[in-house]
């Protein structure tokens, strides 16, 4: 078990060494589009995907996200119980994306999507069946009750509102609720951090829904858990009143709550002690400190999406 514990520490160190962080992000901001592509291909995207990269931005975005998922799913073999379930649910946000894409194809028609996100512990790994009906999807999900209900409730919402957007909205909200429910089974410190993270996710969604998808305020507020004690309602009103998307994103990214959450040194009080005790042989064999893992998974998620936004900006500059 001690060797397993050492492997977990080694994995975290190796992934942090290769991962994205504030310094690398600032460096990438100074590069042109081609420079960012080359850096990510050589340093972040997994070797097995590098030869599959195409020139278009969509391919790059896909393999950046897929590499993130494959790397972070490696932690699941070292985690147990509620901790393992929480990280798995966190990563399965992309399974919710897969399900929404499949349902869009079934409802609206079109070609079956080729680039779904398949990673160890995903609902569909290693291959997605060729679904053609809702019943086929529900049958496939019969052992995954939470995700089966997401599809059922999302489809009911689509039929009631007669607009596909509301299917996705319902499924996204149900995934967030599932993540929050799973966080309640964790240490209270972690639950509080998740609540703060969710409060910022709601505001980011408000920016996306209002400024990108052009939904009205009623639709935006329907997604948000207004009972979240850490929700900054003043910031929410500010981003909804922003004149454009860029201003809304800047308001969100520069907000005190988001900056504090991003910079929160979760390791100073826990993981440093964890590593010291491991060296002295005083730690229970097989234990892995959860907060550094969650911090890494969360921060990589943030920097991945920030980088993709940066790539899209660089493409626009070159047009």
Residue ranges: model-predicted function:
Residues 1-319:
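N-terminal domain-start signal
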């Amino acid at each position: 078990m001690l060797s397993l514990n050492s492997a977990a520490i080694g994995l975290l160190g190796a992934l942090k060494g290769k991962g994205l962080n504030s310094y690398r992000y600032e460096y990438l901001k100074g590069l042109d589009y081609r420079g960012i592509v080359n850096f990510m291909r050589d340093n972040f995207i997994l070797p097995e995907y590098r030869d599959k990269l195409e020139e278009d931005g969509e391919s790059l975005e896909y393999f950046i996200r897929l590499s993130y998922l494959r790397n972070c799913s490696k932690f699941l073999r070292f985690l147990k119980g509620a901790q393992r379930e929480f990280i798995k649910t966190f990563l399965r946000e992309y399974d919710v994306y897969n399900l929404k894409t499949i349902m869009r194809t079934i409802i609206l028609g079109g070609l079956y999507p080729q680039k779904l996100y398949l990673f160890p512990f995903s609902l569909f790994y290693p291959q997605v069946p060729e679904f053609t009906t809702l019943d086929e999807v529900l049958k496939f999900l019969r052992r995954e009750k939470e995700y089966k209900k997401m599809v059922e409730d999302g489809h009911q919402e689509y039929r009631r509102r007669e607009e596909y957007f509301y299917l996705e909205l319902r499924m996204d909200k149900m995934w967030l609720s599932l993540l929050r429910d799973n966080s309640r089974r964790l240490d209270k410190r972690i639950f509080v951090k998740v609540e703060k993270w969710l409060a910022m996710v709601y505001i980011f969604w408000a920016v996306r829904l209002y400024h990108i998808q052009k939904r009205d305020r009623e639709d935006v507020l329907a997604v948000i858990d207004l009972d979240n004690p850490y929700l900054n309602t003043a910031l929410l009103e500010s981003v909804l009143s922003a004149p454009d998307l860029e201003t809304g994103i800047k308001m969100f990214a520069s907000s005190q709550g988001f900056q504090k959450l991003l910079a929160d040194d979760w390791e100073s009080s826990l993981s440093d002690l964890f590593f010291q005790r491991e060296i002295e042989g005083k730690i229970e064999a097989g234990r892995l400190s959860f907060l550094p893992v969650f911090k890494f998974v969360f921060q990589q998620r943030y920097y991945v999406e920030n980088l993709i936004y940066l790539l899209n900006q660089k493409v626009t500059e070159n047009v």
